[in-house]
Amino acid sequence: MKIFKDIITGDEMFADTYKIKLVDDVVYEVYGKLISREGSEIKLEGANASAEEADEGTDTNVESGVDVVLNHRLVECFAFGDKKSYTLYLKDYMKKVLAKLAEKSPDQVDVFKTNMNKAMKDILGRFKELQFFTGESMDCDGMVALVEYREIDGQSIPVLMFFKHGLEEEKC
């Protein structure tokens, strides 16, 4: 199994246990599911409640959300009220990623510069439909993952977007 971590903060962002698609060699799209879980138990949304154990009536801690967000302790970030503030963040973040890339993988710099401009325009065009998540450290200097709900086969599926060059892979 591979864990993908933010190269700036070291936060765990996602693992290769989910369906992943690489877009334009710069953005990983990770397809999540809506889940609810009590304690360590995980239940998928829409499961047949009558086929499950009866509720004892005790107070339990139930958390619901996107599996990738819950499993990797991502935290919703409300720092970007408008496109301009997100664009400023992106420009600053891209400079940091370029510096790391030039140091570790100079052959990827041109790919990153060329394809990232296209990806940024596409993302900014859908800005109002996005949610933003940081890693567990809540450090906005690092990667801010994007979540968008897409209609796939008649279902609303959460798709998380991560910038490939802002991640490092760690084998477990």
UniProtKB/Swiss-Prot annotation:
GO cellular component: cytoplasm; cytoplasmic microtubule
Domain of life assignment: Eukaryota
Signal sequence interval, chain numbering: none
InterPro entries: Mss4-like_sf, Mss4/transl-control_tumour, TCTP, Translation_control_tumour_CS, Translational_control_tumour_p
Gene Ontology terms for molecular function: calcium ion binding
Localisation: Cytoplasm
Keyword Cytoplasm among record annotations: yes
Domain TCTP: 1-172
SUPFAM superfamilies: Mss4-like (SSF51316)
UniProt-listed Gene3D superfamilies: Metal Binding Protein, Guanine Nucleotide Exchange Factor, Chain A
Keyword hit for Signal: no
Keyword line: Calcium, Cytoplasm
Predominant place of localization: cytoplasm
Its biological purpose: Involved in calcium binding and microtubule stabilization.
Family, per entry: Belongs to the TCTP family.
Protein name: Translationally-controlled tumor protein homolog
Gene source species: Drosophila pseudoobscura pseudoobscura
